[in-house]
Amino acid sequence: SMEDAVNHYRDLPAGEEEAPRINYWGYKKGYYFAPKMSYSSSDCPAEEFKDMVKQLHQNGIEVIMQFYFPVDVKRAYILEVIKYWVFSCHVDGFHLLGVHIPTALLATEPMLGNTKLFYTDFSCDEIYDNSDIPAYKNLAVYNDDFMYAVRHFLKSDEGSLLPALGSLRKNPRQTGVINY
């Protein structure tokens, strides 16, 4: 049934950009604290975004935002952006893009303990003590190895079974895995 089909809404970068562009997807530096005006039907995009999140939550759907942070964005600023969207708009999690994302800083921030963070990799040694298993697994790694391994397997490429099975069975103790 449809009630069971959707469990989260993932938004592309939804921050306002410095200069309006056509066919712009938001993968450049922008105004990270301001919802994109063109996504709004009113003159109050922040209120409209909050209302959307509230409606989605009432229907059992989490809100995951995607943010791209270029290398020159400071670590403390990234933390403030994430905290703003969690506490001001009640966003449930983030798909983070960029090269130098301070994942350990975000993952160890007590105020973000229930916030889902998706990234390409996490240095669990910096986040957890020894082999601690978190009570709430809020970190997830995007695994594109799965996509390539399964493609090779589906084409019946030589030696493709073990990599495909390895990708399917991958289940680290401290993070989740999102296969795509």
What are these regions (language model features)?
Residues 1, 63-65, 94, 117-119:
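Hydrophobic faces of well-ordered beta-strands that scaffold small-molecule active sites
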Residues 3-4, 38, 67-71, 100, ...:
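Active-site-proximal loop/turn and secondary-structure-junction residues that shape catalytic pockets
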Residues 5-58, 71-88:
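Aromatic- and acidic-residue-enriched carbohydrate-binding clefts of CAZyme catalytic domains
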Residues 46, 101-106:
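Active-site-adjacent beta->alpha loops and helix N-cap segments on the catalytic face
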Residues 55-64, 86-92, 108-114:
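Secondary-structure transition/capping motifs at alpha-helix termini
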Residues 84-94, 137, 144-148:
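Structural recognition of alpha->loop->beta junctions
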Residues 107-180:
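Conserved alpha/beta catalytic core and glycan-binding cleft of carbohydrate-active enzymes
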